[in-house]
Every structure is written in C-alpha cells, then in structure tokens.
Amino acid sequence: MDKRVYIFFTLFIVTIISHSQEKCDFDSFIKNEFPAKEKNFMEGKLNLKNINIGFIFFKPIRYLGFIDSKIKRRIDVKFLKISKSEINDSIYLAKGKTIVGKNTRLFEGKIQIRQIYSFKYISTGEEGEMDGIVKSQGIIIADYHFREDKKLSATGVFEGKVLLRWYINNKGVFSYDTINNFSDDYNNNQFIGTWTSYKTGVKKVANWGAHRIPCSGDLDIGAAEFMPNEKYYKYGWEDYKP
C-alpha cells in the first residue's frame, strides 16, 4: 500500500473513532452495554414503596469521572447523603461534593427513577456460586439534577441519566449488583450527563461511575481495570492509583 494512502486511511479511521466517542450519550451507552435489550429485558416490577435504593450510591469505594470530553479533566464525586422522598417513592434527595483540581464544591439535588427493567436470564457468578441465590436481577434508569452553590466560582448544574444494576436474593433482599465484578468491563452506577456553568452557560460533558467511566473514549486504556491514558495525565490523572 502507498505510504500516503496508508497515512490518510489511518487518520480517517482515527477521526471516525474520535467523532464517535464525542457522540457517545446515554442511549448509545445502553445499546452498547445491552445489545440484545429488547430480547433479554422485561419491564421490572420492583415495589418502590417497600425498597430504598439510597444505599446503592454509597456502595462504590470511589467514583471515577471526567468533565469536558475534549480534555477529560478528572473529577472526583462523593455522595454525602441520600434520602428517600416522603411524598414520592421514585424520588431521592441527594447531597454530595465534587473535587476538580484544587476546587471542592458541594451540590444538592434529586434523583428520580424513570424505568425499571428485569433480566430474563439472570447471572450466577463466575463459577455459578450465585445459582439459587439470585431471585431476580436488572437495572434502574433514573434522571439526576444536582445544583452547586451559585455564590462560589466555577460552579454550575450537573444533570443527566444514571444506570444502576441491582438484584434481589432468595430472601427478598434488594442488593447492589456485584455478581459480574469478575469481568474486566464490569461497571455500575454509571452517570452520563453534562455540567452547565452558572456564569457562562457553557455546557460540558460530565460522566462518572464505579469501576469504569461511561463514554470515556480513549481516556481508559486499561484491560482488567480502569487505567488513564498518559495523554491526559496533565488533567488530573497523573497521580491516579488503582
């Protein structure tokens, strides 16, 4: 192959990949995670009145995240309090904080459950250790809207959708789903959305999650676990440790 043609072809492919990464959104993420969604999903029947999903947001030891799809600046997210609404079983009130560089900002807002799906075929673990233990398994899709303090600089609004994985054991206990955490691409609590600056109105992609970051493109080059690409080290990832 002519060298010039090869270079052109390579650049063309890289451009397509980069473009597709920028276009990644919640719907495309779901399609990628569950390619046979229509075939393997059914509408869930969780009794929202009898369960409290608040604990799910505290299960991850830490959240991995980035803000701004161009430079993928590191953002650390931590929830401080999640409480179920007393008037609507699908709504949870949230308080937390974010750390971007040297800036720590508090936020508060709400998470509202929109859809519940159950899997037709449940997982039993790497060696079948969960066989007979899992009664049902599925995902929750919710909207979130978190507001930072307008009085502080570099603040705005986080909003988007979150994917939560759950299962119910044979004793009827609603649980955070770690059944497939042996898998290299295991993830949970996947937040996909934007951050909009109060001051400028500029909107930036802001995604975070447990174990992996959704729609992270070339930021994550790890095989068995998340590992940041060296090209993004200067945006807060240089001191990252698994």
Question: What kind of region is each of these model predictions?
Answer:
Residues 111-115, 160-169:
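Extended lipid/amphipathic-ligand handling interfaces
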Residues 207-219:
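Short beta-strand elements
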Residues 179-185:
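Exposed beta-sheet edge/beta-hairpin loop segments within beta-rich domains
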Residues 22-80, 94-98, 121, 128-154, ...:
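Tryptophan-anchored aromatic micro-motifs
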Residues 104-108, 156-157:
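Short, surface-exposed coil-to-beta transition loops
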Residues 81, 98-100, 111-115:
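A mature extracytoplasmic/lumenal domain signature
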Residues 1-25:
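Bacterial Sec-dependent N-terminal signal peptides
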